[in-house]
């Protein structure tokens, strides 16, 4: 499954 931490880092990188 997709890692929740990876999705959090990707969303924070999008500023």
From Swiss-Prot:
Antimicrobial activity is not affected by salt concentration. Possesses antifungal activity against P.infestans but not F.graminearum. GO terms for cellular component: extracellular region. The keyword Metal-binding does not apply. It comes from the Eukaryota. GO terms for biological process: defense response to bacterium; defense response to fungus; killing of cells of another organism; xenobiotic metabolic process. Keywords: Antibiotic, Antimicrobial, Fungicide, Secreted. It comes from Malva parviflora. The lineage of its organism: Eukaryota, Viridiplantae, Streptophyta, Embryophyta, Tracheophyta. Transmembrane segments: none annotated. This is Antifungal protein 3. It is found in: Secreted.
